[in-house]
Swiss-Prot record:
Keywords: Ribonucleoprotein, Ribosomal protein, RNA-binding, rRNA-binding, tRNA-binding. One of its GO terms (molecular function) is rRNA binding. Belongs to the universal ribosomal protein uS13 family. It holds the Pfam family Ribosomal_S13. This is Small ribosomal subunit protein uS13. The keyword Secreted does not apply. One of its GO terms (biological process) is translation. Residues 100-121 have a biased composition (Basic residues). GO terms for cellular component: cytosol; small ribosomal subunit. The gene is rpsM. InterPro entries: Rbsml_uS13_C, Ribosomal_uS13, Ribosomal_uS13-like_H2TH, Ribosomal_uS13_bac-type, Ribosomal_uS13_CS.
Amino acid sequence: MARISGIDIPREKRVEVALTYIYGIGLTRAQAILEKSGVNPDIRVKDLDDGDIQKLRAVTEEFTLEGDLRRQEGMALKRLQDIGCVRGRRHRMSLPVRGQRTRTNARTRRGARKTVAGRKK
């Protein structure tokens, strides 16, 4: 297996798809990386030679990927929570952040329903 950015990418996949196994690289960024490094996107990972892998490593090191990216995202959320803005409070309360309604729906974000006893009439 080829190892790029600390991740073993699958040998049987096309390089274009295999790069998307790295956190922070989607299909569009993978295509840009391959274009910049001059590697054929249709070739399988097992058919890459060491020179191609070195080129891919050099280009991917220009991006923030994997653990660094996860840490950066976590720090951004923590900053929002620390300054006490609306977005930070919504994150802290596990509610939708971008203005969606919560009276109904928002089940994914709020979790399973909590049963409340009915009122006697």
